[in-house]
Amino acid sequence: MGFKCGIIGLPNVGKSTLFNLLTKGNSAVANFPFCTIKPNIGIVPVIDERINNLNQIVSPQKTVNAFIEFIDIAGLVKGASQGEGLGNQFLGNIRDVHAIAHVVRCFKDDNITHIYNQVQPIKDIDIINSELILSDFDLCEKTILKLQKKTLLKNKETQEKINTLKKCLNHLKQFFMLKTLNLNKTEKQLISYLRFLTLKPTMYIANINEEKESYYFLDKLNEIAKKEGSIVIPIHANLELDLVKMSDEEKKSFMKLFNIKTLGLNSIISSGYHLLNLITFFTVGDKEIRAWAIPNGSTSIEAAHKIHSDFSKGFIRAQIIKYVDFITYKSEAKIKEMGKFRTEGKQYYIQDGDIIHFLFNV
């Protein structure tokens, strides 16, 4: 299973430009709404310096990074939850992702139309978030009615679901996102199958330019994100798209000339990884070094299954080397000599950076 991050926002805010930047592809970028009708899916590698360091020691035939799927979802409009602008289809696409990258236009440009004829980032956010809230409200209300019709109403879990959903419904009724509702772990598990849109972890991508007004908009965006526990990543999407096309030498010179210290692109990828609460483990061999993305809190049996179902079915044990030990001692023999080689069972919790060799028998 790939971990999916959906790129959403109003039409003409820079979603497809961002998608092109992430994938270095050529998704159609057009100055009119609904240019992207079917979601474009891009497999984006997660840049990790550790895999480069391992590569220098082992010199394998092949190196494979962990990845995230970014999905460019067509622009939403006011009334999407009622079907406006193919809204139901697009909202359904969002429900399938694990996290959201909400692109917000924070620049003025007379050559790029705004669907509501005025650049107002805060209002734009309200439009999108309101549609997500209304969609969740509708789903929540229908699910409560469905559960109440069940003959097994005395079932404890069903009643707990109803109680939790009523709590959610009341919060949504006040036009609050569910991520701002204080739900405990059990309550979240009870309703997880519904994949509520306003519970999904979100990062706001502020598409800026070099004008001062962009930074005024950016400050306002940060205020909203802070209230709901989201993050904001500023990016000059068109500028960075030009940078992607340059050679490394040209890129360095350009960044130095315009005093660009870090690229928003890298922040988006790493933040997507963080939003999805993922960690990385490595498999290391002469043929291949591979980084694997798994949810934080995964056990060794779950990590084994990530590689292949046979690994988990016939699991015997996992041999663990810490990344820092591998980099320090550079050979398995030396690692064993220093007492840094460990064997773990099925319920060992994988730590970020673990290098694992699975022993199994099918």
From Swiss-Prot:
Binding site residues for Mg(2+): 16, 36
GO terms of molecular function: ATP binding; ATP hydrolysis activity; GTP binding; metal ion binding; ribosomal large subunit binding
Role, per record: ATPase that binds to both the 70S ribosome and the 50S ribosomal subunit in a nucleotide-independent manner.
UniProt domain OBG-type G: residue ranges: 3-255
NCBIfam families reported in the protein's UniProt record: redox-regulated ATPase YchF (TIGR00092)
Ligand binding (ATP): 12-17
Protein name per the record: Ribosome-binding ATPase YchF
Keywords noted in UniProt: ATP-binding, Magnesium, Metal-binding, Nucleotide-binding
